[in-house]
Amino acid sequence: MNNPVRMPGYGASQTAQTDAGLRAHMLGVFRNMGIGLVITGLVAAFIGNTPALAAAIFGTPLKWVAIFAPLAFVFFFSFRIEKMTTAGARMAFYAFSAVMGVSLASIFLVFTGGSIAQAFFSAAVMFLAMALWGYTTGRDLSKFGSFLIMGLIGILVASLINIFIGSSAMAMVISIIGVVVFTGLTAWDVQRIKSEYFAYAGHEVAQKMQVMGALSLYLNFVNLFQMLLSLTGERE
């Protein structure tokens, strides 16, 4: 009887290549996210610690531009991403990060440096824990997506309303719900990004998806940080 030809190393080699590709993809996502956070932090710190510049922005009607520009940028980015090159998408994300830095500069005028650092550290720990869980869990998190997105929309609408009514009680409720929603979104997005890699690996769009994944995780982290700062921050 003839024995079939066997290639015992083929399956293992293919699995290793897939694992290496996934790691490279996720590292690309987190690298872009990290660069975006650095840009945001530098811009926010520079404006927040330059009184004349901060007064020119937040002491005039320009503050409304600073508040709403990031939201407008996200919508623009989402609708234009398919027509952008990978390099163009990456530069647009970095530009958005700078715009977000202008918007976040106001925290340096309201909260102490120590409480800002504490909220950032807490957000980083929570974000990393949920990202790791989302990456490693075998549980399907996609079923939670609709609830998390509805929660996100609710937070967005309530936050816009509270800009004009200025209710501290409403702000606290938004922040508490926001912490839950954005930690959940972090795990959900990481698993989604991982799944999308397997669907589009080898295609040119995969590189662009690194940028979109970075934007999603960046927004989760920044919003989680803001919610924690609102809850725990010590005011000047």
Task: Describe the function of each predicted region.
Residues 1-236:
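A hydrophobic alpha-helical transmembrane-helix feature that marks the membrane cores
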